[in-house]
Amino acid sequence: MKKRVMIIGLDCATPQLVFDRWLDDLPNIKSLIEGGIWGKLRSTDPPITVPAWMSMMTSKDPGTLGFYGLRNRVDYSYDKMSTANSTFVKEPTVWDILSERGKKVILIGVPQTYPPKPVNGEMVTCFLTPSTDKQFTYPASFKDEVQRVTGGYILDAVGFRADEEEKDRVLKTIYDMTEKRFRLARHMVETRSDWDFFMMVEMGPDRIHHMFWKYTDPDHPKYIAGNKYESCIYDYYKFVDSRIGELLAKLDEETSVLIVSDHGARAMVGGVCFNEWLINEGYLVLKSRPAAPAPVEKCDVDWSQTKAWGSGGYYARLMINVKGREPQGVIERGAEYEGIRAELIEKLRALPDHNGNLMDTQVVRPEDVYKEVRGVPPDLFVYFGNLAWRSVGSIWPAQPESVYTFENDTGPDDANHDYHGIFIMRERPGEQSLQAEGLNLKDVAPTVLSLLGEAVPADMEGKVRTRDHLGKD
């Protein structure tokens, strides 16, 4: 019987819900855990969808990949940004390697696969696809079958940061999207017999966390007991588990199955207006304030007086205005650069929250966490409150009374990302449950290749985590 590997990716599925709170109510996931290897999966720095999935599937860290989030600096100018789609991925993925070796692959919804690249098999691209009017399959002719089977494929739940009156509509879209994706996956298993590697990624968990976390987490500062969405995330997890069960029922016993996520989730307390803080501290100087809230690249900044600026998001990126690197750089390379970095690290780590308590902010130098640093990296990553707070990048028309805010500048959002996702792997039937420690997202690609009996490229940064290899490293 042919050896195969299937990965079911659940973007943002988080261990405190899957492993700790709801496992007994997720029978299909529980059955894989009871006969497989499982544990928390350390995400990338930063722990975010792009670059995490591609780091997972290339076994290379973001520094090697050369992109550090969905949007990245094009160069060392102040305003040029680009979206990291598939054209940014220069390192070989698992499916690239398998395709070159004559193995058949099927991909559905894996982040950063748009625009589609040729594979030895079939592909449906990801949430970065602008619409299904674009070419979102490989081969192009596969598009008609996808639309017929799904009744109209849904790429993403657009508007997941919607206002209150839109929540029911978007919630229905999340369910419809998930249903169609799993329907397509079942169809592919039923109608294709020659695949070796199958991977799908469902974005629904991420969307539902960001939209409904405050309604379901009693520890969230905005939680209200008895609200109409209290069981919303729980109900969705049970729905996903049922669809996983239907898909597993289509597989033979020689198929190894992995369920993985790229990062976890946690309650978001609020936001730190990062650039406003930098203005207050004298690092960022404006010529004038904007007429409406705006990011730095759209503001009238006095770059000749500016030492550093930042970006917003679930984590912050801090850039230093370096002489000879940025167009109007003021900080000399070497000792002055390292001095201001050290100064900023010290100040950010000491930052109190809105109540005056130490926030426990983590600050990361790229060179400390990456094997090498390519592209145009930030000078520092900042995880406010150890990811309990987000970075708000907007600069306001008038100086705010406080750098702390409890309303998101890009729409309602009450969950942040967390450092650990989930890893569950059933290699073969009839084995005992084994909880593994120290699992890293980069371990997935070499593990898949090993399961298929394929040689693991020497430059992959992760470890093989099959049952035979655990404990040997």
Regions found by a protein language model. Give the residues of each.
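Active-site-proximal alpha/beta segments of enzymes that process anionic O-linked groups
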Residues: K2, P15-D194, M203-H210, K463-D468
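Structural motif
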Residues: I7, F197-V201, L258, I424
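Generic recognition of well-ordered alpha-helical segments
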Residues: N28, E343-A350, I422, D443-L451
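A short aromatic-rich beta-strand->coil structural motif
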Residues: L98, M200, L318, V382, ...
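A long, amphipathic alpha-helix that forms part
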Residues: L171-S193, F198, K214-I259, H263, ...
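Long, internal low-complexity/basic segments
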Residues: P377, P397, G438-N440, V444, ...
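Low-complexity, glycine/alanine/valine/leucine- and proline-rich hydrophobic stretches
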Residues: N386-A445
